[in-house]
């Protein structure tokens, strides 16, 4: 039922910037303007984006709000692959690519996963009679958390306590965040 709600709410718009994302970027611009008004007293704001439509819309939401905050500035925007070296450094930075290809971090992640993974929420959802290997069950347990965490981020009302205890949620959150920290 929850997955159906996600599919209905997203309406095949995977990867597009939604109104929540637009609001977040406008909010960042407003806070930046209020924190550093002298920076925007006059002059030109130049913004660049990669070729990704979501990235372009993020840039436009941000710069549009800056222009709304101060009529004394002019705004110039540009997007395209020519800016990849600036905004997609993870694709071109050779040291980072070598780190991602070197699986040295996998040991630390594997140990942390083994110590903190909780599969009880998943087993409560699908039942205990499924014969799944450890890798599959850990992937599914994290996917269950990821869907749950994403519901609120998408503005969909979601009560995680129907699926997770607070301790289970914290443990899955910590695994997901540790992975993000190691990889990104």
Task: Walk through the language-model features, giving the residues of each.
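Signature for phosphate-centric chemistry
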Residues: 1-44, 52-184
């Amino acid at each position: 039922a929850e997955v159906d709600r996600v599919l209905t709410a997203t309406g095949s718009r995977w990867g597009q910037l939604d109104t929540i994302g637009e609001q977040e970027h406008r909010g960042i611009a407003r806070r930046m303007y209020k924190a550093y008004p002298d920076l925007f007293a006059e002059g030109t704001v130049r913004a660049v984006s990669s070729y990704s439509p979501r990235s372009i819309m993020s840039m436009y939401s941000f710069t549009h709000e800056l222009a709304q905050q101060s009529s004394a500035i002019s705004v110039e925007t540009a997007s395209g692959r020519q800016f990849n070296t600036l905004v997609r450094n993870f694709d071109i930075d050779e040291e980072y690519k070598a780190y991602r290809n070197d699986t040295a971090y996998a040991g630390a992640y594997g140990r942390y996963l083994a110590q903190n993974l909780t599969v009880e929420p998943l087993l409560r959802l699908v039942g205990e009679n499924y014969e799944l290997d450890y890798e599959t069950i850990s992937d599914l347990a994290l996917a269950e958390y990821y869907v749950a965490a994403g519901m609120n981020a998408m503005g969909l009302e979601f009560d995680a306590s129907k699926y997770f205890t607070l301790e289970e949620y914290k443990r899955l959150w910590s695994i997901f965040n540790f992975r993000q920290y190691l990889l990104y």
